Amino acid sequence: MGGRMPLLNVSPLKWPISLKIPAMTVCVAVLSCTTVATFAGITSVATTRSLIEKHLNYVAISMRDALLTKLQATKFEVEGLSANPGLLQLFNNTSVGFAAVSPTDLTAASVDKVESGKFSLAATPTTKFYVDNYQKLDAWLKPLAAKQSYSGILLANAEGAIIYSTGTNPVGPVDANGSINLAIASSANSQEAVMTDFTPPTLSAPGQALYAVAIVHPFIPDKRNGTLLISMSTEMLNAVMGQAKGFGPHSEALIAGSDGKPRSLSSISRDEDAEAVVNSDLLSQGIKTSNFGAQEVLSASQQLKWQDHQWSIIALEPEADVVSASTAMLIKIIGITAATAILALAMAILASRSISGPLAGLVSIMKRLANGDINVRVAGVDRRDEMGEMSRAVLVFRDNAIARVAAEDDARSAEEAMEHDRRMMEMERSERLDEQARVMAQIGGGLAALSDGVFSRPITVDFPEEYRPLKSDFNRALGQLRETIRTVAAQAASMSSIVSEISCATDVLAKRTEHQAIVLDGAVNTMDAISNDVSVTANAANNADALVRDAHSAAAASDEIVSSAIAGMLEIEESSAKIATIVSVIEEIAHQTNLLALNAGVEASRAGEAGKGFAVVASEVRALAQRSSDAAKEIKDLINVSTQRVERGKELVDSASELLKHIAARVDLIRTTVSNIAATATSQAKHLSEFQTTIAEIDQSTQQTAAMAEESDAACRSLNAEAQHLLELIQQFELGGGSSTRQPQSPPTQRYFMSR
């Protein structure tokens, strides 16, 4: 104690590190933890409350969605069951059997069902069919109701009477104002399942709701045969709401109707004597604080609309649980703050000792190094903190001191070795310069001969070992260059010979092509003349074809005229026959008139004086009849003559008609022949024109070929000149080995002749 008392009179900034670091760490930790604890205390209640509100809202939404899913699934199950063919058949059979049962038997069976829950109708001849089908429905629907947690499954016929139930409901007519009859009436005009609202539950009995859906006739789809009713208990709602999990042990979720009455039981408010009612402010959607039962609660409400019903899904958390959660959070924060301060103090003490101890050791080591002790051992170089960095820095100082002493010794030894090496290198450099001079002289001589075009002087002097690859490469390059020049010379001579032959052949080709062009030009002129003659022939044939067509048309017209004349003569002949008939009638009339006049004269002579006048008239009539008869004979004779002449004319016209038809047939044959001649002449003219065009194109192509042959000949001459120039250049080189680069004699020119 006595050693540390003077620190009370010293500024904390001048305290040793072993005291300064723990003191500063504790102060910072206490200040930070106090600030955090204060802020956490202020915000913990609000944060906890916000989390609980969000969780309650999530619970309300989850419960709403779960209940909606359950209601939809139940609706689909009810509708699917109502459309089941097996149920339709059993329902129809049960309805038929129910109609045959007497009211007395139904009453007795209903009493037993209400008391014992069992259907005990005796199977008589009139009830057997109903009982059998009832038992079949029992075997199917009771397990289904238990599996789906239904309170009961009921079947009502078209008159609204219950014909089957899985529970204790009696069979027979129902109360007109009861829930079953209301459910049947609500589904009367709907194709879907209709649900009634849940009745509020009590502690002694759960509430009920009914799903009702029409059952159609099995043979008449548009006819309603009855109703399927599914009874659901509020126990289903309790099971769904029981899944809600809040923050506290007393949190829960419940369902309330628009009338404020709960549809599920609550653990917060249980009053069997008084009817529980939910405050109206809890029914509206949102998060709020209100009273429920005898407690103040935090609630979140969500609205659920299902068919015609409006419900509120309310998640509740007692306010006491909310406050207790905030208090527990604050206590945890204070405990964490205190533990943090204590831990910070312990860590500060350990940190200060871990720093002050190694620092004292480093100070001692640095003092020894300053006194020239380079064999000192540096501790702490393996540490990964700042003390390790400082230890490694001191180690560097020690190593530098050791290296400085060793460097002084090495410098003296290196200076002596460098002097010896310098003298040896001077001697080797002088010898290498002499060898390089000899090698460069040989290579220079070879390159000088190469520049003069001499390729037959390789290097034969021996080179030192390191320069022998240079000699080998030079001699190999010289040999390859010599062989290349020889090959080029041979190829140039061969190319000159080939070009000469091509030039001669091209010259002959040009002359032949020129001769062909002259011949083709004459052929073109001849074809022009032939084409003109054929065109004239075609035109003449076309004119003849037109004339023959006119003659054919005239012959056809003459034939028509002759036909008309024959028809006219036939009409004249017919008219003559009719006139002859009329003349015969006139002769008959004249003969009869003459007989009448004769009879009249006889009668007049018998009459005496009184008939004289009548006798005169009869005489005149007889004379007139005689003249008519004579005239009729003359006309008949004339008609006979005319008929004979018409017959003769008709024969002549027929002969002329046959002759004209023969002429027309010959003219038609001539027309066809002339048309064929004209078509053939036209086709020949067209083909000659095309052939003339082809000949002209051949002539043009031949002229182009002649021009190309002249160009090829000029190119061959130019190439031959280049080959000669190349041979002259190659002759400047001396290849050695008896080879000569003089231009070889050209082979005899080979003439190429083209067959005509």
Swiss-Prot record:
Keyword Transmembrane helix recorded: yes
Cited Pfam families: HAMP, MCPsignal
UniProt GO cellular component terms: plasma membrane
Any one GO molecular function term: transmembrane signaling receptor activity
Residue spans crossing the bilayer: 26-46, 330-350
GO term, biological process aspect, one: chemotaxis
Membrane topology, record value: Multi-pass membrane protein
Domain Methyl-accepting transducer: 491-720
Region called Disordered, residue ranges: 736-756
Gene3D superfamilies assigned: 6.10.340.10, Methyl-accepting chemotaxis protein
Locations listed in the record: Cell membrane
Keywords, in A-Z order: Cell membrane, Chemotaxis, Membrane, Methylation, Plasmid, Repeat, Transducer, Transmembrane, Transmembrane helix
Domain HAMP: 353-406, 434-486
Entry-linked PANTHER family: METHYL-ACCEPTING CHEMOTAXIS PROTEIN 3, PROTEIN ICFG
Function summary: Chemotactic-signal transducers respond to changes in the concentration of attractants and repellents in the environment, transduce a signal from the outside to the inside of the cell, and facilitate sensory adaptation through the variation of the level of methylation. Attractants increase the level of methylation while repellents decrease the level of methylation.
Name of protein: Probable chemoreceptor y4sI
